[in-house]
Amino acid sequence: SNLTTIYNDENNEFHDYLVEKLPTKYSWQIHFNFAKNNEDGTPDTNWNTAIANEAFRKSWYYGLNLSEYWKRTNAIDPFACENNFYTMKGLVYTSDGTDYTELVRQELELPELNGEQIVRLDAEKAEQYKQQAIEELTALGVTFPVEMDYYIAAANQVSLDSANVLKQCFSDSLGDDYVTLNILTYVSSSTQEVITPRLHSALFGYGWGADYGDPQNYLGQETYGNDNAYFSASYNYINEVEANENTQNLIDTFVTFTEMV
């Protein structure tokens, strides 16, 4: 791209004027759909059972390396996209000047961001949770690889290129024997054609920018049983999940989170 060309050429007239600008209050995440439907309107039982499993989700957390995908957003400094929190760095500080996300990082016992590798990744834990998930989910009738439906705008080459990079990230990180990403398309409206009918397995790069700088405004979007919780009502559909022995742990996790918020 022109930006990369300028960055790599110290003699370029614009090189010394490049300044990286990060969002001030917006935070984007991956949002799972816990009540996914097939295109015929029936529940996608294989996906819904898999994503309700804690070990399955943890294998993604510890194993999914998105650094190549981030380059589609920031080719010069892809690790500037790394954010392991609901809020973005710079939203709010304590009285002694400590960034709120630093407090969360310490509570999560995550290493400091280093700009070289994703700090949440742990290959040993990822493999441990992968094998645990395969064992538990196979017993529930889940078939592998679990298929993840990922929708992009039709006839959009940039979106297709990014989706192919994301697909490769899944292949390299989790293995084609475990999860495969299906690239599907919508015609004009992702909301009307995909999100509202609940056809997506997960949404990438969807998030929130609160009207006022309070972490609770971000956390509240994921609460359970609240029609005004944006993520819950519009992205992950946790309130639509039927309680049973396979989903109760997932629901209990959301209930506990809601009580904490």
Locations of regions flagged by a protein language model:
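Extracellular/periplasmic solute-recognition and catalytic clefts
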Residues: 1-39, 73
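Short helix-loop capping/hinge motifs at secondary-structure junctions, enriched
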Residues: 36-56
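Append "and occasionally in soluble cytosolic enzymes with long acidic Gly/Pro-rich linkers
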Residues: 50-172
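Extracytoplasmic/peripheral linker and loop segments enriched in polar/acidic and small residues
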Residues: 57-58, 62, 66, 70-73, ...
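Loop/turn elements at helix/coil->beta-strand transitions in domains of secreted/extracellular proteins
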Residues: 13-17, 55-57, 65-67, 144-147, ...
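Short helices/loops that flank or line small-molecule/ion binding pockets
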Residues: 1-10, 55, 164-172, 189-202
